[in-house]
Amino acid sequence: MGADLTTIAKKIGWKYHSTIIWNEGNISRRTAWGSWMSASAPYVIAPVELIVILYKKDWKKINGTKLNDITRDEFMGWTNGVWTFNGESKKRIGHPAPFPRELPRRCIKLFSFVGDTVLDPFLGSGTTVLEACSNNRIGVGVDVDRKYCALAKQRIETENSQLLLKV
C-alpha cells in the first residue's frame, strides 16, 4: 500500500521523504473464523499503519514562526521510524476508523511550528484538529460526511472547551 501511494503521489508532483510505521500494539483480532491452527487459510495480521511523508517543493520549511515546542526527548524518539502505542476504541469515539491523539500530536509537533496551519482533509472524529489546536496550531478539517463534521465539532467542544470550530 505504501509503495502504491508513493508511486501515485510522485506521478502528480509530490516528492517522497520517509515513512513512519505505527505499531498499534493493542489489536484484538488474531485469527479469522475457520482458520484457527490450520494451514487451510490462516489470516496473517499486521497491526501496523504506514504514515508516508510527502512534500511538494523543498523539504526544509523556511516560512512561519520557526518556534519549536518539541522537546529533545520527543525529537530523538519520534525521528525513529517505528512508533509503538495503542490504538483507539471505535465505540468510545463513535467513528469506524479512529486513531489515538498521540498519532497526530507527534506528527504535528515534529513537522510544524507553533502557529502553523494544519489541514485534515479527512476530518472524521476531529482528532487531528483537536491536537492541532491543543498544540497551538490552527486546525482546519473537512469531511464529505456532515455527521462526522458534527461529531468532530461536538468532540472538540467537549474535550477542549476553549477551542472554536466552525462547520
Locations of regions flagged by a protein language model:
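Core catalytic lobe of class I
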Residues: 1-151
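S-adenosyl-L-methionine
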Residues: 153-167
